[in-house]
Amino acid sequence: MARMSTNSTTPLSHIRNFSIVAHIDHGKSTLADRLIQTTGGLAEREMSEQVLDNMDIERERGITIKAQTVRLHYQANNGEKYILNLIDTPGHVDFAYEVSRSLSACEGSLLVVDASQGVEAQTLANVYQAIDNNHELVTVLNKIDLPAAEPDRIKEQIEEVIGIDASEAVLISAKTGLGIPDVLEAIVRKLPAPKSPGGEKAPLKALLVDSWYDTYLGVMVLVRIIDGVLTKGQTIRMMGTDAKYQVERVGVLTPKMVNVDSLGPGEIGFITASIKEVADTRVGDTITEDKRPTAQALPGFKPAQPVVFCGLFPVDAADFEDLRAAMGKLRLNDASFSFEMESSAALGFGFRCGFLGLLHLEIIQERLEREFDLDLIATAPSVVYKMYMTDGTERELHNPADMPDVVKISEIHEPWIRATILTPDDYLGGILKLCQDRRGIQIELTYVGTRAMLTYDLPLNEVVFDFYDRLKSISKGYASFDYTLTDHREGNLVKMSILVNGEPVDALSMMVHRTAAEKRGRDMCEKLKELIPKHMFKIPIQAAIGGNVIARETISALRKDVTAKCYGGDATRKRKLLDKQKAGKKRMRQFGKVEIPQEAFIAALKMGDE
């Protein structure tokens, strides 16, 4: 770790804190690379593509998951030296929470739009978050070296859709490095300096922006100082959890860790303070000095609530403890991921996990399988339902298998979302039909040039399964989708159980809307019929709601040719043998156990993907 003696604080007027707001793939992380390179944050040999995307998954999928930060030193054209703090944010809807934290630590944003593709749904969502945080915006059009780039049309589109002036947009190509100096100048010229109401003499007041786990240093906390000075050796107190810690190390990321003596107002840096778990550091908490606390805590963020739940089970039961340890480690870095133990008759011991959305679920599952070398089965994702019971109480339902007797429930409410979909108008018909099939309610439909912008209210239950994949396939990948949770509404929901040979299989039960139950049940039974191997007796597969069977398939029995040893001879002899076989099969059907192979579970749970 490099040592860097810096004068304790930089004047506020020479600090700029900014984040980059963009849709996936519009070149946000590449722009961050160029800014680091241009200001000399890393030597040429240390540069790698997407410096800030540390996780392998981030680089492979080309998405940013965790927000990262960098401090850049920049000498402007007017000869003054500035410190620029960049917080790179994720663009995907599931990580909107990471975005909101990063934005609250900055005063301005670069709005990056792909000059060939224009404004996308997530650009909108993140821009509105930035505007809500009173950010100044500098518009940057990226990828202008592409033959398909149309900067003038996109500028108009930005003004039309977002309603901000884009006439002075900076034109760049992050890949070739064209226009990067103009971006740096625009940051210094157009973005505001941070404000510090109390200045450095005031009691310490800092915002906890993020925390992550470092194997050598323990929990590292990213802070944005509002008032006062944070120095090494100080005893600090978290105002939300009331925990006290002694600061061991203060530093900044350039993206390398560099130790400094102190951080002053407006600066962003990290501290370590022998904190045991990331769960002890609440993002959005206010950090203050224990002896001289600040009077008023900062307005925090609301904690991220898990939206989608699913069970994760190890394929090999012996891996259960490893899975528990692995989840604990992931939880260190990702406070929005929650889990509790559960057991299933079909799949053994596992965990019920909560996620922010489907991408979050996929990424956690992939990280568990990759980084910890585990084989997992995920049950069908479900959302949180609110149940109003007949005795006047209210309960939450996370797992369809735990649903109480229907007689005791007076109403079930399910979560709804407000979705914004942007699509080229050629695909509009297909997308409208998709939303309608998913019980969507159209709120508005507007046109922006040749693209339609749809606003729909949809039940989250319908979106969780395979909505995003279907949307992408209908629109050949051109539509973009973003959503926010709105409220819970009453729904005609039923629990559909799958019975194999008369036994309910808990891992396959799901909540469905009554209108879709029959089709889902039939599909599931057909799928299981293909997947469960034949036994010596015939096996009925049924989908049932309560006591009513709504779909059924039968797997026929394998039979041994018992009459093979009779050459010619008496018909009654054959009859006797066949009757004896029939009685045996009947007995077998009563006591026989049906083995459902793991593959059948995995395939049945993926059923929505076709």
From Swiss-Prot:
Checking PROSITE patterns in the record gives: G_TR_1 (PS00301), G_TR_2 (PS51722)
State its Enzyme Commission number(s).
3.6.5.n1
Any one GO MF term held by the record is: GTPase activity
Domain named tr-type G is located at 13-195
Gene3D superfamilies associated with the record: 3.30.70.240, Elongation factor 4, C-terminal domain, Elongation Factor G (Translational Gtpase), domain 3, P-loop containing nucleotide triphosphate hydrolases, Translation factors
Q: List the disulfide bonds.
A: none
Q: What is its main location?
A: membrane
Tell me where in or outside the cell this protein is found. Answer: Cell inner membrane
Q: Which reaction does it catalyse?
A: GTP + H2O = GDP + phosphate + H(+)
Annotated GTP binding sites: D25, H26, G27, K28, S29, T30, N142, K143, I144, D145
Task: Indicate whether GTP-binding appears among the record's keywords.
Answer: yes
Mind telling me which GO cellular component terms the entry cites?
plasma membrane
UniProt keyword terms in alphabetical order? Cell inner membrane, Cell membrane, GTP-binding, Hydrolase, Membrane, Nucleotide-binding, Protein biosynthesis
In Gene Ontology terms, what is a biological process of this protein?
positive regulation of translation
| Organism superkingdom | Bacteria
Q: Give one Pfam family.
A: EFG_C
Which membrane topology term applies here? Peripheral membrane protein
Q: Which family does it belong to?
A: Belongs to the TRAFAC class translation factor GTPase superfamily. Classic translation factor GTPase family. LepA subfamily.
The record's section on PANTHER family has: TRANSLATION FACTOR GUF1 HOMOLOG, CHLOROPLASTIC (PTHR43512:SF4), TRANSLATION FACTOR GUF1-RELATED (PTHR43512)
Which protein is depicted?
Answer: Elongation factor 4
Phylogenetic placement of the source organism = Bacteria, Pseudomonadati, Pseudomonadota, Alphaproteobacteria, Hyphomicrobiales
The gene name on file is lepA
